[in-house]
């Protein structure tokens, strides 16, 4: 955990208003009430209970020749004042732990223009699989998307070897 960032906690219905406010502050439109119940849904709050970020992961079947069905990192938002402080990394590592209990690989779709997200995912061992203007139901206006994958089996083996 980086620099005193609290651990991710399961998202609860009481968190939904703060998630919507955070999303709106970033020019987005999260609707947590519509998300599935079998997902990994996490939040990080400071000691005062203020939302610093949220994330989710779930099984996705994109019906796409390029992007396979699998467990995907599905969304993450971090408050502007909390970026580059470990919140996104902590949320992503927790989601990867959740996926590792269910699958041998994790997938992610990132806008090619999102350099910070690409850097984070590469630092966590994700590798680029493909680029396309559309991956599954995600259409990338003004650019392309990057399909990333991480082999969780070799990651677990490497972690065990270091112990």
Residue ranges and their predicted role:
Residues 99-111:
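Conserved GNAT acetyl-CoA-binding A-motif
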Residues 109-110, 125-144:
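Conserved catalytic-core motifs of GNAT/GCN5-like acyltransferases
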């Amino acid at each position: 955990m980086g620099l005193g960032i609290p651990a991710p906690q399961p998202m609860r219905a009481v968190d939904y208003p703060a998630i919507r406010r955070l999303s709106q502050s970033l020019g987005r439109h999260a609707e947590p009430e519509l998300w599935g119940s079998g997902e990994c849904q996490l939040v990080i709050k400071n000691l005062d209970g203020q939302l610093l970020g949220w994330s989710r992961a779930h099984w996705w079947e994109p019906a796409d020749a390029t992007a396979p069905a699998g467990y995907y990192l599905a969304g993450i938002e971090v408050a502007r004042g909390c970026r580059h402080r470990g919140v996104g990394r902590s949320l992503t590592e927790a989601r990867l732990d959740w996926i590792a209990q269910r699958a041998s690989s994790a997938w992610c779709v990132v806008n090619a223009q999102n350099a910070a997200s690409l850097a984070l995912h590469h630092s966590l061992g994700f590798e680029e699989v493909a680029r396309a203007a559309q991956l599954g139901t995600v259409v990338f206006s003004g650019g392309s998307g990057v399909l990333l994958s991480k082999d969780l089996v070799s990651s677990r083996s490497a972690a065990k070897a270091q112990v």
